[in-house]
Regions:
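Conserved C-terminal beta-signal and adjacent last beta-strands/turns
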Residues: 192-198, 202-204, 211, 235-239, ...
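Extracytoplasmic beta-strand/coil segments of soluble accessory domains associated
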Residues: 23-26, 62, 66-103
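Gram-negative outer-membrane beta-barrel transporters
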Residues: 160, 387-394, 475-477, 495-586, ...
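Transmembrane beta-barrel wall of Gram-negative outer-membrane proteins
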Residues: 178-257, 276-299, 339-341
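Short acidic/polar hinge/loop motifs at secondary-structure boundaries
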Residues: 102-130, 187
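Structural signature of Gram-negative outer-membrane beta-barrels, strongest in the C-terminal barrel
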Residues: 246-250, 289-294, 342-346, 352-356, ...
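Membrane-embedded beta-barrel scaffold of Gram-negative outer-membrane proteins
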Residues: 295-312, 358, 419, 426-427, ...
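Short, acidic, small-residue-rich periplasmic hinge/interaction motif at the N-terminus
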Residues: 20-54, 62, 92
């Protein structure tokens, strides 16, 4: 209650600061299905556009997210291996991932970003910090919103084809690599446009896209990765633009193979009993409808469905099959751009119901019935965005989540920003987040409390025609963290607590002759706290939790830069990223220091044909340019150099 009172007082003072000289801003887009408008938001947000994706030289979503300050991105081995993201010191299962409006985290909160191809993405929105007031449960460390290409009002065709090779390191002491070359190729096609271009009563647009990746890996043993993605969508606008319906469907099939023993260890050939295979089928569907009942106000209904089937096979006894289904129903009333002489208001109130089911397949193993569950979370929420004379802004959200077994939680979120001039914005805020226990954790511990986080931040953004700078200072804490302990009962308990603070910096220099430098830097301090009982100090996972010691896999310093140059039809960029030293674990009770490393990449394209109707270019991209051997995660050697050459064609008419 004291926190709420303080926030109300801050907001009251803040509203009085709004001055009358209006600053002309471009029309900002909304973030996700909220009232937040990008350019006016007081929180830490990074938007990655389609053009930035195409010219980044990135092979995966993980490569793109490494450029976001505050995120520590780590990958286990080669392409297809698990990509974990630690946002501002939080755990890797504290990131809420939303794709085309569908929440897509695995049971327990984890998400492998490697299963997403980047060829059909229109934009990526990254909100750092807890955001439960706007997005609900699981939004502890960050919210990552991925928008694939949408139906368009004119015919558009996009084609991409590329091929190349992975070059492994010279033969090492455990025989995982031999300096060989392994083939990789990718293709993508997208077609969108109107279905009834000349109709005045109803407008229908469509999109259909397909992508595939075939990567033979980088080691002697088979560690190949295959990925296929099919997306489709339809937009309908009718009744004088009052009725809007959008539906999206996505099917993804991914297989990754990696040489491990049945216990998961990677070692010399003699110790590897076989190649493990992880197969996924992910299907998501969504329909979003809204109807304008009065001017600037509408009723809406969203439905989303997510299915995740996983099969893991190896030559040992570790075969596992499981599936998960999520259905979300969201009903809301929304007001947009309601204004008087002083304030412009956007507001939304709603009710959301999430039904979640998962189970092991009946014939999978002796664990066939251990983890089956069917549970729900129902939520009521409200959010409001206030615009004071186009100079000061407030985004406020509050949400009550009620879990069938783990209780109710209220979570407020407040962010404020003010433009001191057309170039300088000051911002800051307070936010909370929760994550309810996953089914694995609750099998023998039904009384667990949700994990909770709380964060404060303050920052500034400055931009003119020559350079841009963004600076954020933050401080956060996470409580009731759920940990596994091999001794005692139940196995999972609310034991761990953590604190973090840091500075995030990013910016851009625009030099002469279309030369630019983009940069980002993160300084992060983390520590475990209140580790003062024998359960934690003498049990499994103690390596990760030592009192007043840094958390694992979170470097204190990290950053990078991209230098790009355009000359006539030629575009070239070179990137360098730095990951500082960090602690990792050798086993459940022993931690080791993992050394820092640099990663270099190169991208170039040549526009050989372009007019008002189409554009064609060839491109080349190289990752791990100098074929440096490193370990992003201890005991997992990262892949060597990858070089790709390709062709891209885009047309519109």
């Amino acid at each position: 209650m004291n926190t709420i009172i303080r926030l109300v007082l801050i907001l009251t003072v803040f509203s009085n600061l709004a001055y009358s000289s209006s600053i002309e801003l471009t029309s900002p887009n909304k973030i996700g299905n909220t009232t937040i408008k990008t350019q006016r938001f007081g929180g830490s947000t990074t938007i990655i556009t389609e053009d930035e994706i195409k010219t980044s030289g990135a092979q995966s979503l993980g490569d793109l997210l490494k450029q976001v300050p505050g995120l520590s991105v780590k990958q286990t081995g080669g392409r297809g291996g698990l990509i974990s993201i630690f946002s501002r010191g939080n755990e890797s299962d504290h990131n809420l991932v939303i794709i085309d409006g569908v929440k897509q985290n695995d049971v327990g909160g984890s998400f492998n970003f490697e299963y997403l191809s980047i060829n059909n993405i229109e934009s990526i929105e990254v909100l750092r910090g807890p955001m439960a007031g706007f997005f609900g449960s699981s939004a502890l460390g960050s919210v990552i919103i991925i928008n694939t290409k949408r139906p368009s009002d004119k015919t558009e065709i996009s084609l991409m084809n590329s091929f190349g090779f992975n070059q492994s390191f010279k033969k090492d002491t455990v025989g995982q690599t031999d300096g060989g070359i392994f083939f990789v190729n990718e293709q993508a096609i997208s077609v969108s446009g109107p279905l009834n271009k000349d109709s005045n009563d109803i407008n229908i647009g469509y999109i259909l896209s397909y992508e595939r990746i075939d990567d033979d890996g980088y080691r002697i043993f088979n560690d190949a990765f295959n990925n296929k993605v099919l997306n489709a969508g339809i937009n309908i606008v009718a009744l004088d633009d009052k009725l809007k319906i959008q539906t999206m469907v996505s099917d993804r099939w991914a297989t990754v193979r990696y040489p491990t023993s049945s216990s998961g260890g990677v070692g010399a050939y003699s110790s590897v009993s076989g190649t493990q295979r992880d197969w996924r089928h992910l299907n998501s569907r969504s329909i979003n409808t809204s109807y304008e009942i009065y001017e600037n106000s509408s009723l809406g209904f969203d439905f989303s469905y997510f299915f995740n089937k996983r099969v893991t096979r190896d030559s040992g006894s570790g075969n596992v099959d499981w599936w998960e289904k999520k259905k979300t129903y969201n009903y809301y009333y929304e007001i947009e751009n309601y204004n008087n002489d002083l304030i412009t208001l956007d507001a939304k109130i709603g009710y959301e119901y999430l039904d979640e089911t998962s189970n092991y397949h009946a014939n999978a193993s002796s664990f066939a019935t251990d983890y089956g569950h069917n549970t729900y979370i129902d939520s009521i929420y409200s959010m409001i965005s206030l615009n004071f004379n186009d100079s000061a802004f407030a985004d406020i959200g509050i949400r009550k989540d009620d879990h069938e077994y783990h209780g109710s939680k209220y979570n407020p979120t407040v962010f404020l920003s003010r433009y001191m001039s057309s170039e300088l914005k000051l911002r800051g805020g307070y936010s909370r987040g929760i994550k309810y226990p996953g089914i694995y954790e609750t099998y023998s511990a039904t009384s667990l409390d949700p994990e909770e986080s709380e964060s404060y931040e303050i920052g500034m953004d400055y931009e003119n025609t020559l350079y841009a700078l963004s600076l954020t200072l933050f401080k956060s804490k996470t409580d009731n963290m759920i940990a596994y302990r091999s001794s005692g009962s139940p196995s999972y308990r609310n034991l761990d607590e953590a604190r973090s603070k840091g500075i995030e910096v990013s910016g851009l220099f625009k030099l002469q002759n279309e030369l630019s430098i983009k940069y980002w830097l993160t300084y992060l301090e983390t520590k475990a706290v209140n580790v003062n009982n024998t359960v934690q100090q003498n049990s499994y996972n103690y390596a990760n939790w030592q009192d007043d010691e840094a958390l694992l896999r979170r470097p204190k310093t990290s950053g990078g830069l991209i230098i790009s140059k355009r000359h006539n039809n030629l575009y070239v960029s070179a990137d360098a990223s730095y990951t500082g030293g960090r602690w990792d674990y050798q086993n459940s009770s022993t931690r080791l220091y993992n050394e820092s490393f640099w990663d270099f990449g190169l991208y170039g394209d040549y526009l050989f044909s372009s007019d008002d109707l189409y554009q064609s270019k060839v491109f080349i991209q190289v990752s791990n340019l100098f074929n440096d051997k490193r370990e992003e995660i201890l005991n997992f050697t990262s892949p060597g150099r990858t070089a790709m050459i390709g062709f891209r064609y885009d047309t519109s008419k």
